[in-house]
Amino acid sequence: DSIFTVRMPAGIAVCGILTNGGTLFTGICGLKTPVKKLAWVFVLNGLGTVIPAIVSWSNVVDGATKLGATAAAVMLGKLGMNPVSWLLNGLMCGVLMYLAVIGYKKAKDSLHGIAAVLFAIVGFIVCGFEHSIADMGYLAIAIPSLSFWQILQCMGMILVIMLGNVFGGKLMRMVLVDWQEKDA
């Protein structure tokens, strides 16, 4: 279960999405994005993680129960955290994902852009910060192993994390862009 073999494919996927002009929820949180578009991207990105997880229920016969139980244990562990921790961990993820997307967009070439993305993603994974879209995928995998009440609690937790992701992106925009424009 090393970070590089299990979680780094997410970093590669983010690079692919950005390279092909895709929109990432945590990447646009800090941009001047209308709330309606932000909500729409949240739903679409969430579906992009939830649908493959649900499909995996029927396609992975051996190990599906074990995978679901592991994902459930992860989600229940997160539920044991203080809601302020969810918000702050979401905020820090939002900061790093904003830096990833801005770093990618402002990079002088693709190699530097990819390095910015991978640096930010490794940072939020190693630090244990919370990413609302990723947590939707974990929840979808865990659903067969959770009670209805636990699913509702996880959904509430993901909403708090999502707010943290948004606040983190907005905070970085204030620090890096808005204050500079104000001083100019």
Describe the function of each predicted region:
Residues 1-184:
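Alpha-helical transmembrane segments and their helix-helix packing motifs
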